Amino acid sequence: MATAASNHYSLLTSSASIVHAEPPGGMQQGAGGYREAQSLVQGDYGALQSNGHPLSHAHQWITALSHGGGGGGGGGGGGGGGGGGGGGDGSPWSTSPLGQPDIKPSVVVQQGGRGDELHGPGALQQQHQQQQQQQQQQQQQQQQQQQQQQQRPPHLVHHAANHHPGPGAWRSAAAAAHLPPSMGASNGGLLYSQPSFTVNGMLGAGGQPAGLHHHGLRDAHDEPHHADHHPHPHSHPHQQPPPPPPPQGPPGHPGAHHDPHSDEDTPTSDDLEQFAKQFKQRRIKLGFTQADVGLALGTLYGNVFSQTTICRFEALQLSFKNMCKLKPLLNKWLEEADSSSGSPTSIDKIAAQGRKRKKRTSIEVSVKGALESHFLKCPKPSAQEITSLADSLQLEKEVVRVWFCNRRQKEKRMTPPGGTLPGAEDVYGGSRDTPPHHGVQTPVQ
């Protein structure tokens, strides 16, 4: 009896070592390591923890053998009980466990698990076939997922791709990370016997609850049905599409890049110079003096400007800031004067009201050049010459006469003091035209 008990105890330890020490894929050729070593250790640890002592697998083996062999009735009681049960004549086991390598138990029931875990040769082959079918289904689902991703917008495809790792990573990492400890201990076979990852965040049959899967799978599950919505702002704020750019008008449109009045507000120095020249020519052609323009600006627009200010504007002698402020007002005045040329307007009335002396005559540049050339020939023309010259230049006779008078006074101012210019007597016709204060004064006796 002692020998039989010791043999049975050795049978227990050796059979347990055969079951648990055999490497994956050693029971069946071509299995290709259908389980990972980490999964086996975790499953065995779950079985040990659920049954409460380290010989739980061995006890389950004895239970199966006692029913299958028909030898001893009390074989499943423990170490000593196993020895007592093995004393029958009909025991199918020999003293050496290696004597009958073909006899293996078919079913081992995990008492702490949800269902039965198969460890027989046929069961292992069946599990291998199931896993191959699951892998094929996963490949088909991945192909469908890729087709769906090709139909999505680019930002949704990128969003979904960041949260879909490979099936192997989810089988080993996601299930171990998201299952609670009690669930992992009681359901040891669940970690590797059932898949924990499918496309679009759906779990396999009998898998973990839907609330335990990764938040990235929830986002990916929602995206196919709501592809037209933006990604979740809390999970992926950087995936939101950028705001659309502001609309731009045609290239030549002033409102496309800047304010429509920016050219008038900040003109360049070249623009100011060209406008001042154009303004002076238009003012002279319309027959308005600088004082008339300043008075008209004060009456029409509320800004009174003197004749000196208008003169300095035309001569570009104001500061750049003041030139920029005065330019739009003068431009408006020019537009109104051009539109009302040829008929008496409010500008003419305003100029007449403010005019206390004879209107200052403005002479164009071309007319002034003709008068200047005639002055060089004859500084003091006769009345007949003045009349003919006024008719040829379409000017009044009084205007021509006053111009020659003013020109002679200008020539005298240009004469250096204490002497006369060379040929001055020839120009002015002797000393009879010389003013009295230019004569030789005798000292007082």
UniProtKB/Swiss-Prot annotation:
The modification Phosphoserine is found at S343. Residues 264-338 form the POU-specific domain. Residues 67-90 have a biased composition (Gly residues). One of its GO terms (molecular function) is DNA-binding transcription activator activity, RNA polymerase II-specific. GO terms for biological process: central nervous system neuron differentiation; cerebral cortex radially oriented cell migration; epidermis development; forebrain astrocyte development; forebrain ventricular zone progenitor cell division; hypothalamus cell differentiation; myelination in peripheral nervous system; negative regulation of gene expression. Residues 217-226 have a biased composition (Basic and acidic residues). SUPFAM superfamilies: Homeodomain-like, lambda repressor-like DNA-binding domains. InterPro entries: HD, Homeobox_CS, Homeodomain-like_sf, Lambda_DNA-bd_dom_sf, POU, POU_dom, POU_domain_TF, TF_POU_3. Its main location: nucleus. Transcription factor that plays a key role in neuronal differentiation. Binds preferentially to the recognition sequence which consists of two distinct half-sites, ('GCAT') and ('TAAT'), separated by a non-conserved spacer region of 0, 2, or 3 nucleotides. Acts as a transcriptional activator when binding cooperatively with SOX4, SOX11, or SOX12 to gene promoters. The combination of three transcription factors, ASCL1, POU3F2/BRN2 and MYT1L, is sufficient to reprogram fibroblasts and other somatic cells into induced neuronal (iN) cells in vitro. This is POU domain, class 3, transcription factor 2. It comes from Mus musculus.
